[in-house]
């Protein structure tokens, strides 16, 4: 038996942006559904954060999500666990967007509590987002389940949230040593340590996703093989502009159509050529253009300066400052805020 596994779709993501929905839809139209049909797959496992906004969703966005995705999904058996973005309260799953918005779809089974079931010859433990309301039963299932595979929406220490930025806190990998495999949503970057693997979301959504491969997976329960299906489409592109070394008169603008473009200006002498570049980008149909001017300093006296990421600098500052609070808790709070800020463009 083959099942499709997808996670962190955030179907209403980027505030329901029409540009992003067109990008999402292209993946479903050209990659996801054709692959399911070609592989003869009839079961889809959704590992959480199907929707993005915990508080609200506009009617127009919901209508196109239902028409373009969930109506097409009626031919499949769907098993969907809750993620942190689909629960209204942070300490309870009682009110959640999937149960409220998808009641009309009899083919979709939604899990707000841990649940064991079988696909083919494999036993699965489904672990929705763990909060105050389901923590006790979740802990018990993690410790006692005899399932082969655990699928959840988990926060596990040491994994990359985005390339180069590691999550600190949450559960330890050793907590899941009883399972042959652990597959999780939540972090959008694909990564693996030991038996634990973050599967990654299907498509780019923010600039920190640039060039980070995305897609979904197919699992064959009989061969125990997990296969990644890459999404070849990208919505963020970069142009390194240097009119001293390169002419842009024959530049291929079409590859930037329907994308968000960031121009990194290395050298700009021909201002007329640069303005023509901008005009042609908008003419071909880019969503937006951002320009980053670089400063070149020929003095190499600072070549040994250590470069640190934002989160490291924040943690070092907390370590140095004299404050009457638990610094570990403060670091976790700053990490959460930083991750949320990375999702704002």
PLM region spans:
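Divalent metal-coordination and catalytic microenvironments
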Residues: 8, 44, 49, 65, ...
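Active-site environment of divalent metal-dependent phosphoester hydrolases
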Residues: 10-14, 52-55, 81-92, 117-118, ...
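Accessory, non-catalytic peripheral segments of nucleic-acid enzymes
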Residues: 221-345
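Conserved beta-sheet core of the metallophosphoesterase superfamily
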Residues: 162-226
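Short, conserved loop/helix-junction motifs that constitute active-site signature segments
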Residues: 70-74, 141-145, 173-178, 254-256
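Core catalytic region of metal-dependent phosphoesterases/phosphodiesterases
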Residues: 2, 9, 13-116, 175-179
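Conserved catalytic scaffold of divalent metal-dependent phosphoesterases
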Residues: 86-173
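Structural motif
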Residues: 3, 43, 122-123, 149, ...
């Amino acid at each position: 038996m083959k099942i499709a596994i997808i996670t962190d779709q955030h179907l209403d993501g980027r505030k329901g942006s029409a540009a992003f929905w067109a990008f999402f839809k292209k993946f479903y139209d050209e990659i996801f559904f054709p692959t399911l049909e070609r592989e003869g797959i009839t079961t889809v496992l959704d590992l959480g954060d199907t929707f993005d906004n915990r508080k609200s969703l506009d009617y127009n966005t919901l209508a196109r999500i239902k028409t373009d995705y969930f109506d097409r999904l009626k031919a499949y058996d769907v098993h969907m666990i809750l993620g942190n973005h689909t629960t209204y309260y942070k300490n309870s799953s009682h009110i959640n967007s999937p149960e409220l918005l998808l009641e009309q779809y009899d083919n979709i089974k939604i899990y707000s509590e841990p649940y064991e079931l079988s696909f083919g010859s494999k036993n699965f433990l489904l672990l929705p987002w763990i909060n105050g309301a389901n923590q006790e039963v979740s802990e018990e299932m993690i410790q006692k389940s005899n399932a082969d595979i655990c699928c959840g929406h988990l926060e596990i220490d040491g994994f990359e949230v985005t390339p180069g930025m590691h999550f600190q806190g949450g559960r330890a990998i050793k907590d899941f040593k009883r399972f042959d495999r652990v597959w999780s949503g939540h972090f959008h970057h694909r990564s693996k340590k030991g038996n634990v693997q973050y599967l990654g979301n299907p498509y780019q959504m923010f600039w920190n996703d640039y060039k980070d491969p995305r897609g979904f997976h197919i699992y064959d329960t009989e061969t125990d093989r997990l296969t990644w299906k890459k999404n070849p489409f990208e919505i963020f592109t970069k142009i390194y502009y240097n009119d001293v070394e390169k002419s842009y008169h024959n530049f291929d603008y079409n590859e930037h159509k329907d994308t968000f473009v960031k121009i990194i200006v290395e050298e700009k002498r021909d201002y007329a050529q640069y303005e023509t570049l901008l005009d042609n980008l908008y003419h071909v149909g880019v969503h937006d253009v951002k320009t980053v001017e670089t400063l070149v300093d020929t003095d190499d006296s600072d070549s040994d300066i250590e470069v640190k990421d934002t989160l490291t600098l924040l943690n070092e500052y907390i370590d140095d400052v004299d404050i009457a609070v638990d610094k570990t808790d403060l670091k976790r709070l700053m990490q959460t805020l930083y991750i949320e800020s990375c999702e704002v463009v």
